[in-house]
Amino acid sequence: MNPMILLMLLITILSGTSIVMMSSHWFLTWLGFEMNMMAMIPVLMKKYNPRAMEAATKYFLTQATASMILVLGIIINLIHSGQWTIMAMESYSASTLLTIALVMKLGLAPFHFWVPEVTQGVSLNSGLILLTWQKIAPLSLLYQIYSSVNTNILLVMSLLSIMVGGWGGLNQTQLRKIMAYSSIAHMGWMIMIMIYNPNLSLLNLLIYILMTSSMFMLLMFNSTISTLALSRTWNINPIITTTILIILLSLGGLPPLSGFMPKWMIIQELTKNDSVILPAVMAILALLNLFFYMRLAYSSSLTMFPTTNNTKMVWQFQPMNVSFMMTSLISISIMALPLTPLAMILY
């Protein structure tokens, strides 16, 4: 793809998300979603092949269906309230339709089926945009209307997402699918705490974006897309491989890494609201994610292929031209847990 065309598409995606975040009018919100979707489709098809075409088609069908449900909810709310303002939610059916549309765009269970397939069919940099930046616009709109939506629907969908994100990643060998199921589980945690403390949900989103961006950057740096390829990179670039495994454990929420901080704060917030069974169930389901992350770490670093001493020579190692941005993201993704007291004060 021509770099100028790609730059225009990325600017359009940025503009669409910004419009959704800053607008208080339903028409502008819908317009921002459409700009985002139409610019994202060519980005998904950047590498022209049948898998990318199939992934872009699935993405378009899902997002178009969600947009139709969103427009239907907007029209019903307009009939009841007579206003285009986002905060003027006076219809229960409209809020339910809007919730369904937003969780479809986010990829929460039971509307999650498109996320692993689309992520697997596109390149790593397109998957990075899909699993990070594309979550911001639906979450920002849900943040604005969370007080008007049915909390029981969000509760059930978030629990299902945590469960599906754990179970779905157990037998996966493709790293992009593993990251997709990890995204589903993290979205479940964000939506769950949004019911009780929306600001904490934004903190969770920030840490998730940092960890996922670091993971995808390292995979692109290493040109790794499967667990088999990851296990073979140890003899070539052990430092990068070790960093990938540490970030995977951070995504799983293993202390004392950064990924433990949002889970810790979410469970603490739920217990403050006299909820005991719910955080216990969430913590047990989170062990599923941690299990397949630890299994991936074990198979990649502790069970290596038989090699000769010549393969471990210095001349075999690839030069590490790591950027400052990647280094900063990796550092935050691993060592942000000491900032937990400050985060508790702010949120």
Swiss-Prot record:
Q: Does the keyword Ribonucleoprotein belong to this entry? A: no
Q: Which residues cross the membrane?
A: 3-23, 25-45, 59-79, 96-116, 122-142, 149-169, 178-198, 201-221, 239-259, 274-294, 326-346
Biological process annotations from GO: mitochondrial electron transport, NADH to ubiquinone; mitochondrial respiratory chain complex I assembly
- UniProt keyword terms in alphabetical order: Electron transport, Membrane, Mitochondrion, Mitochondrion inner membrane, NAD, Respiratory chain, Translocase, Transmembrane, Transmembrane helix, Transport, Ubiquinone
Q: How does it sit in the membrane?
A: Multi-pass membrane protein
Subcellular localization: Mitochondrion inner membrane
Q: Which Pfam families match?
A: NADH_dehy_S2_C, Proton_antipo_M
Q: Which domain of life is it from?
A: Eukaryota
Q: List the disulfide bonds.
A: none
What enzyme category does the UniProt record give? translocase
Q: Which GO terms describe its cellular component?
A: mitochondrial inner membrane
Catalysed transformations (reactions): a ubiquinone + NADH + 5 H(+)(in) = a ubiquinol + NAD(+) + 4 H(+)(out)
The record's EC number reads 7.1.1.2
Q: Which GO terms describe its molecular function?
A: NADH dehydrogenase (ubiquinone) activity
Q: Which InterPro entries match?
A: Complex_I_Subunit_2 (IPR050175), NADH_DH_su2_C (IPR010933), NADH_UbQ_OxRdtase_chain2 (IPR003917), ND/Mrp_TM (IPR001750)
Q: How does it assemble?
A: Core subunit of respiratory chain NADH dehydrogenase (Complex I) which is composed of 45 different subunits. Interacts with TMEM242.
**What is the recorded function of this protein according to its Swiss-Prot or TrEMBL entry?**
Core subunit of the mitochondrial membrane respiratory chain NADH dehydrogenase (Complex I) which catalyzes electron transfer from NADH through the respiratory chain, using ubiquinone as an electron acceptor. Essential for the catalytic activity and assembly of complex I.
The similarity comment for this entry is:
Belongs to the complex I subunit 2 family.
Name the record gives this protein? NADH-ubiquinone oxidoreductase chain 2
Name its species.
Sylvisorex johnstoni
As recorded in Swiss-Prot or TrEMBL, the protein's gene is named: MT-ND2
